[in-house]
């Protein structure tokens, strides 16, 4: 008696790459057995632009406009890490007012980044309404950025020793009004999303990462804190002036997509607390360290006194990076953003190595999606929160 055998062939599906304004140029080669994911292979590099090598052929002030193209949804953080390294190498002091302004801008940028994560994440799992709501609040933040820096995105606002310009008249009151308004908006999001049974069905227990895996994979940011580890570089390293503000590290212990959502929602509330304290205690004084403009006193000024008086041309501060090695890091919206710098008594860094949080966090994706359903891939990928400009560099 012949027993007929059924031959099963796996299906290989290409997901992406998409346009950078959507999910980014990430390609996933997914092997399926029906609806079950057997394997997933991420293909990177479509947005690689050689950002590290560009840094090694530019002075820091020349390189600043490039760094806003890493994570183009949280550009204040890439600017901050770019100036923090040379400031520590050169032992340059940042005035207290400039440090407060930096903190305000960083936390506004964190909120904007989390908002633009929340909207597409909800759209991916079938909820279209929050996608339109988040742009309403994001526009207010971008209006504040435009008033202070002149640009809605790609701000080029941070400088070695301070910031490019002081806050304009009336900006503090406008920002304070936004903080009061945004707290009600977060309550609206929580009412609309957090207890929604369809939302909970899609995210609860999906993409679970335990504490041991988080540490072994080197994950950071909301991915780390959603698995029960209270680690936030704003508390650990106390860079800028975060130690002067009262706020709590947001964390969950479940480690699933819902926990990562709750961490980011809580972080937006804590960012508002930090901004309100910074606005209330904003000190007077200079917004930049004027001493860094006097590194080279021997050269004749490029413009005469008359032109300086009426055109207000600022010199471009550049100095030799001492022969040292340094690793600096900050808590970006997606995790630990770091720079490893090697100076060589030159205006250009000898080595500029970027530690991007998105690239590190993305490594665990194949493990998380195995034995899950095809529809869960977008839920898990969205909960990681990546920007391909930062991943590919």
From Swiss-Prot:
InterPro entries: NADH_Q_OxRdtase_suD (IPR001135), NADH_UbQ_OxRdtase_49kDa_CS (IPR014029), NDH1_su_D/H (IPR022885), NiFe-Hase_large (IPR029014). Its EC number is 7.1.1.-. It catalyses: a plastoquinone + NADH + (n+1) H(+)(in) = a plastoquinol + NAD(+) + n H(+)(out); a plastoquinone + NADPH + (n+1) H(+)(in) = a plastoquinol + NADP(+) + n H(+)(out). NDH shuttles electrons from NAD(P)H:plastoquinone, via FMN and iron-sulfur (Fe-S) centers, to quinones in the photosynthetic chain and possibly in a chloroplast respiratory chain. The immediate electron acceptor for the enzyme in this species is believed to be plastoquinone. Couples the redox reaction to proton translocation, and thus conserves the redox energy in a proton gradient. It is a peripheral membrane protein. It is found in: Plastid, Chloroplast thylakoid membrane. Keywords: Chloroplast, Membrane, NAD, NADP, Plastid, Plastoquinone, Quinone, Thylakoid, Translocase, Transport. This is NAD(P)H-quinone oxidoreductase subunit H, chloroplastic. It comes from Phaseolus vulgaris. SUPFAM superfamilies: HydB/Nqo4-like. NDH is composed of at least 16 different subunits, 5 of which are encoded in the nucleus. Belongs to the complex I 49 kDa subunit family. It holds the Pfam family Complex1_49kDa. GO terms for biological process: photosynthesis, light reaction. One of its GO terms (molecular function) is oxidoreductase activity, acting on NAD(P)H, quinone or similar compound as acceptor. The keyword Nucleus does not apply. Transmembrane segments: none annotated. One of its GO terms (cellular component) is chloroplast thylakoid membrane.
């Amino acid at each position: 008696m012949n027993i007929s055998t059924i031959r099963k062939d796996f299906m290989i599906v290409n997901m992406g790459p998409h346009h950078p304004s959507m999910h980014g140029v990430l390609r996933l080669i997914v092997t399926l057995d029906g609806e079950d994911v057997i394997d997933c292979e991420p293909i990177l590099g479509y947005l690689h632009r050689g950002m590290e090598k560009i840094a090694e052929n530019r002075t820091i002030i020349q390189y600043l406009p490039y760094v806003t193209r890493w994570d183009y949804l949280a550009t204040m953080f890439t600017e901050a890490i770019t100036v923090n390294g040379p400031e520590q190498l050169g032992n340059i002091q940042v005035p207290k007012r400039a440090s407060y302004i930096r903190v305000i801008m960083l936390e506004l940028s964190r909120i904007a980044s989390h908002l633009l994560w929340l909207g597409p994440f909800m759209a991916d799992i079938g909820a279209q309404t929050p996608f339109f709501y988040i742009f309403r609040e994001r526009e207010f933040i971008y209006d504040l950025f435009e008033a202070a820096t002149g640009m809605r995105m790609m701000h080029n606002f941070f400088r070695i020793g301070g910031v490019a310009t002081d806050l304009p008249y009336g900006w503090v009151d406008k920002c304070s009004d936004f903080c009061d308004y945004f707290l009600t908006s977060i309550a609206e999001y929580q009412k609309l999303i957090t207890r929604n049974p369809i939302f909970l069905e899609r995210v609860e227990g999906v993409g679970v990462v335990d504490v041991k895996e988080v540490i072994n994979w080197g994950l950071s940011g909301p991915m780390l804190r959603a698995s029960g580890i209270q680690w936030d570089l704003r508390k650990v390293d106390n860079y800028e002036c975060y130690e002067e503000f009262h706020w709590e590290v947001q964390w969950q212990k479940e480690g699933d997509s819902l926990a990562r959502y709750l961490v980011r929602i809580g972080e937006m509330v804590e960012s508002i607390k930090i901004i309100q304290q910074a606005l209330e205690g904003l000190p007077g004084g200079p917004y930049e360290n004027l001493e860094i403009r006097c590194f080279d006193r021997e050269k004749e000024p490029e413009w005469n006194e008359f032109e300086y008086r009426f055109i207000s041309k600022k010199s471009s501060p550049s100095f030799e990076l001492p022969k040292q090695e340094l690793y600096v890091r900050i808590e970006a919206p997606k995790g630990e953003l770091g720079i490893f710098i090697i100076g060589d008594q030159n205006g250009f860094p000898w080595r500029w190595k970027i530690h991007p949080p998105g690239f590190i966090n993305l490594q665990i994706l194949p493990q998380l999606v195995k034995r899950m359903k095809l529809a869960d891939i977008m839920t898990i990928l969205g909960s990681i929160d990546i920007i391909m400009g930062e991943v590919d560099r």
